[in-house]
Amino acid sequence: MDPFEFLECSICSEEVIDFAAIFSSNKKFGDKACKHNFCVSCLTYLMEYNTRNKKALCCPICREEFDGFIQNKTSSDLLKQARKLSSAQIFLKNENSKLNEEINLIKNERENEAIQYRDRIKQLEDSKSKQVQESTNIKSRIKEMENEIQSLEQARLLDLQNNQSKFDTQQQQILTLTQSYRESQSNYNDSNLRANELNNQIQKLYREIEGFKQHAQQQDNYIKDIDSEKQLLQQQLSTIEQSYDRKQSDLLNNTRLKDLQIAKLSDANQQLGTSLSKIEAECEHFKKLYKEIQEDANGGYQKNKNLESAIASLNIELSRSKSVIDSLNTNKRTLEKELEEMKLLYQFGRGTSISSSIAPPTIINTANKITNSSYNLINNSIGYFMGSKNYLNDITKPYKGFKIEEKRGNKTSQIHKVSIGNGCGHFVIKLIPTVSGTNVGNSYSKFIYNSIYSSTLAESEILLFREAMLLYKLNHNNILKLESITKDESSGKYYSVLSPFVPKDLEFILAENSQNFGGLGKISPTTLTFSDIKYIVYQLISVVHYLHTQDLVHRDLKPTSILLFDDYQIKLCSFGNAISVFTNFGNSITQPTYSNPSSYSYLSPEYICSVLDKENHSKLSNEIDWKAFDMWSIGCIFLELIYKKKLFNNLNLDNNNNNNNNNNNNNNNNNNNNNNNNNNNNNNNNNNNNNNNNNNNIESNFNNVNNSQQQQLYSVLNNISTYKESAPKNGNLYFKENHNIIIKSKVERDFNGANLPTDAYNLLCALLSFNPTTRIKANQAAFHKFFKDEPYYIHDSASVSPNKLEDLSSLLTDRNIKQFLKEKCSNLIQV
């Protein structure tokens, strides 16, 4: 049905396109009675016809007279728009109906899926309830077994205590008898006869003791048979997937056999107690004999002495018998420990992977062959008989207990932010990497392979855990603490778990607080005030002083090694190159590695010269004072805090960065800017020429440069030489006395135009002395007068120096790493 049917022309009955509205001069207020619609063409023809025939103008329908008409364009436009909207409405209705049909179809599908999910959830809940019931039954059974073992152990201990008390009483009686026999000197002939009879009885007792030893040997063989049966049980585990029902019954029988074996050991202990009772009876018999001899003997000093020897021999044999009893008890405890290890296997299987290195190695070798489905079957069977027991260890934690929240680094240098539990307690886990250039392996993949398939570390691999040992043993407020060591079983990687988590480092703070104005080297005012710089440097010197008092050197001090809280309290990290000064530095393993060129800016000149001097490298590297090396690095950091930029940087890298910046400006700016950039490039080229001339003077004292690392070190050394007031003419910078490296006026000019305090300038010069023998020591810098007016300054040297009882220097050498792993990580790492 057309919704615009009522708009047809009353004359031609066609659709009205152009509306014509009639009007009458005597009806000016819209009170005309005619309400019909006319199109312009029809009404025009009607008026022309009536006018030509001189007829009155009137509506052909209602005959109402009118004087004329007007063409209503507004009504025509509204009609066109209404028709368009009507078509759109019809189209949208059709689309809406289609969408409703699709929605209903999707809704029906979702309802069907929801029904299926509810059925599946119900099935899972039923299965869960069954498993919970089975677990409850298993736990109750395990509890009963543990109570039974505990009661047997208590009874055994009580019997041993009673036997020991009786034995002590008998020994006292024997001593009393011996004293009585010393007083007896009569009836020598009769006592001789009695003594011979006693010797025969002692020989008989010796034979009984030998039989007892054979019985003990049989017990040892019996225990070995138990071990072989346990190994047979482990071999049977590898085929449990094909014969689940049969193996489940075998496990039940073997476990019961273990209980019977423990019961047999208890019976053996009782038999030993019976044997001990027999020996006590023999002692009572000897006591009676002694009384008879005391009554009848009239002498015989020599025979009495023989009797004393016999009594002493008897005491020795009794002690040996007691040792045999203790040995059997030890074997029993060994069997109980093996039973606990099997319990641990069950407990560990419920919480983490079967191949975890905290499980016993003999069990892991068998369990590594078992598939996941087989392991589920083993859990269901072993779990019925064995409970769980927390494996006591000092610092190792399971890797799955940590939730990784943020990842940083690459394959060989990974640092992750992690949390435990419900997200509380943030820590940092750091990858323990391989040592480049050692016989650990040619690639990291080889190390991972060895870590996954073998929990035993080679001697060279043990050094990888030097940083972990140091962070665990060091105790200072400004050093990160090692909380635990963990292992990712999926990749075989070891991680150090460190605390606390500090979100920022000094390099980030320097980047935040520096701004360059037009390349002029002027530093804008920042939130990092001079008092904040002073506080940071004091903490850094204090923690290095602590390390040096423990005869430990860091060897990698740089802004990224210094973590900062919001109140500028620091935490020192990156102990990968740290080492004891008692170490033999002639070994290549003990030499520091600086793979990142950003570290070159903080290397001391004597170390750079030792690297560049290839002929005397080994000799010079052994003569380096690494404590002075750390103090130079502190001076570089102090100077960078003042300038907000690196001063002893790689000139080649800086120039490349400047040229790249200029090229970018050329592409983005107008011709005027291009001219300015060309001028800057010319200036940079002039500076490069000057630097190259200085570098040639230094390079002439060494061999030719062969690699990019040496080129960068030459550039850093050249930068240091050009910055100081009076540089030596050759590369042996550490053999020459020099003037101050820092020009105070230059520092003050760049330091926001402020006056640098004299004490700060003196400390900078002392830290950045070219001669390491005259460079300030950590204990001197910690009490420098630059810090004396600050509230955190400690005036008493005894308060800063470590307590003598806390001297750790002998515990921080490389030879202690293996002992550290044995004591703290024995269930994770085998050494």
UniProtKB/Swiss-Prot annotation:
Residues 414-787 form the Protein kinase domain. The keyword Hydrolase does not apply. One of its GO terms (cellular component) is nucleus. Keywords: ATP-binding, Coiled coil, Metal-binding, Nucleotide-binding, Zinc, Zinc-finger. It comes from the Eukaryota. Pfam families: Pkinase. Residues 83-348 form a coiled coil. PROSITE patterns: PROTEIN_KINASE_DOM, ZF_RING_1, ZF_RING_2. One of its GO terms (biological process) is intracellular signal transduction. GO terms for molecular function: ATP binding; protein serine/threonine kinase activity; zinc ion binding. The keyword tRNA processing does not apply. CDD domains: RING-HC_CeBARD1-like. Residues 657-703 are annotated as: Disordered. PANTHER family: CELL DIVISION PROTEIN KINASE (PTHR24056). Belongs to the protein kinase superfamily. CMGC Ser/Thr protein kinase family. This is Probable inactive serine/threonine-protein kinase DDB_G0274613.
